[in-house]
Every structure is written in structure tokens, then in C-alpha cells.
């Protein structure tokens, strides 16, 4: 009976063990800038992974992009095996054809033990027409 109780306790604790060890995602960037960024084409996204433990490294990531106004997910990379965390291209995203749309994105990463982090906070970018970001006030 004691063995059965320990076994059940172990099974209940398993989901807690699968979480990555105190990994946090910070400094979300779009074209190497933080905050709401205006982009004319496919944005390149980035982030910084932080962990209090030495030797922790990113082995994979997943990016999700949603429309800010509806919350509808318009692009998700799925789990991508990569240690890259800067200037990640979104050139495969077919949603990026609507000018003046605000998009929200977030990311999560996997560590060397294949445990996922929590999703990052959300960051924004806005798609603008070609040449708009270099426009000047004529008044």
C-alpha cells in the first residue's frame, strides 16, 4: 500500500518536473528594437533567455504571432530546433500583407533537458506600407 501511495505521489509531481528550470525570457526585440516597432516587411524577432543556473542553454524555440485587435493566431512556428535567439526571420508568415495592422508576439524556449519555459510576455510590432517609416512631416 505504501508503494502505491509513493507511486501516485510521483505521478502527480511529474508535470512539475517537466518545466524548464527557472528560465525567463526577456528583452523581446523586433529588428533589434524594443517596444512597438514599425516594420515595412517581414520582421526579424529576438529575445534573451535568462536562468540562474550555469550551463543552461536554449535548444529550441516556438514563436506565436496574433492579431492585436482580434487575438487570432496568424502564425506559429511550432517547435524549432535551434539555439538562435536573435534576428529570427518571419519570411514564411503569409499574414504579413495587411498594412497598419498591429501584431502581438510571444516566444517560449526549450533547454538542454528538453523542458519548455513559460511563454514570454507579449511584444508588439506594426506593419506599415513600403517607404512609410522614412516619411517626413510636410507641415
Question: Which ranges hold each PLM region?
Answer:
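Position-driven detector of the extreme protein N-terminus
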Residues: 2-3, 15
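Sec-dependent signal peptide recognition
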Residues: 3-10
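Hydrophobic h-region of N-terminal signal peptides that target proteins for export
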Residues: 10-19
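Pro/Thr/Ser/Gly-rich low-complexity, intrinsically disordered linker/stalk tracts
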Residues: 21-53, 126-133
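Residue-level recognition of well-ordered beta-strand positions that form the cores
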Residues: 46-48, 64, 108
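Recognizes extended acidic, P/S/T-rich segments that occur
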Residues: 56-102, 112-119, 135-139
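Terminal edge beta-strands and adjacent linker/stalk segments
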Residues: 120-124
Amino acid at each position: 500500500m505504501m508503494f502505491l501511495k509513493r507511486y501516485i505521489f510521483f505521478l502527480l509531481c511529474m508535470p512539475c518536473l517537466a518545466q524548464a528550470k527557472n528560465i525567463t525570457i526577456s528583452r523581446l526585440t523586433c529588428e533589434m528594437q524594443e517596444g512597438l516597432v514599425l516594420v515595412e516587411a517581414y520582421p526579424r524577432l529576438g529575445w534573451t533567455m535568462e536562468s540562474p543556473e550555469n550551463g543552461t542553454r536554449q535548444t529550441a524555440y516556438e514563436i506565436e504571432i496574433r492579431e492585436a485587435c482580434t487575438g487570432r493566431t496568424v502564425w506559429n512556428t511550432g517547435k524549432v530546433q535551434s539555439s538562435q535567439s536573435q534576428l529570427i526571420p518571419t519570411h514564411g508568415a503569409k499574414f504579413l500583407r495587411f498594412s497598419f495592422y498591429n501584431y502581438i508576439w510571444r516566444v517560449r524556449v526549450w533547454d538542454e533537458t528538453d523542458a519548455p519555459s513559460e511563454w514570454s510576455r507579449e511584444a508588439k510590432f506594426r506593419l506599415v506600407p513600403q517607404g512609410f517609416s522614412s516619411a517626413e512631416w510636410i507641415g
